[in-house]
């Protein structure tokens, strides 16, 4: 597998909005959604040090701003297996769920079953990612394995 894996994540802090704490019982396994670039399940977050993260996007678009009042921060375990997507070229290196669409639809179930704990997408580094991953509006991480979440 020729995926870009980030190994040194200990100093990177993430924030999840919509809840004040992480409840592993509420974590749902990853499930592909046909013809959609985002799966069901997992936990979504963005880096705390980003200039334009999820909180900023929600405020600008007036999207569920009431959910921004609750949040929790975490880091990921040092042994976490995380794919970083910085460009459309990176995106092409991961399994695709469907070839029947013009959009690139990652096979999240395949990634998770092959030991990938999370996927982090850097939309800000390649604007074409925004078009190819419709629905990924800002740089964000999708946690697919709850065991890598370390509360801070």
Question: Predicted regions span which residues?
Answer:
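Residues immediately flanking
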Residues: 48-49, 123
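A short, charged, amphipathic alpha-helix used as a generic interaction element across diverse proteins
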Residues: 40, 49-58
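A short, exposed loop/beta-hairpin motif centered on an aromatic-Gly-Thr core
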Residues: 26, 30-47
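Active-site and NAD+-binding cores of ADP-ribose-processing enzymes
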Residues: 6-32, 59-152
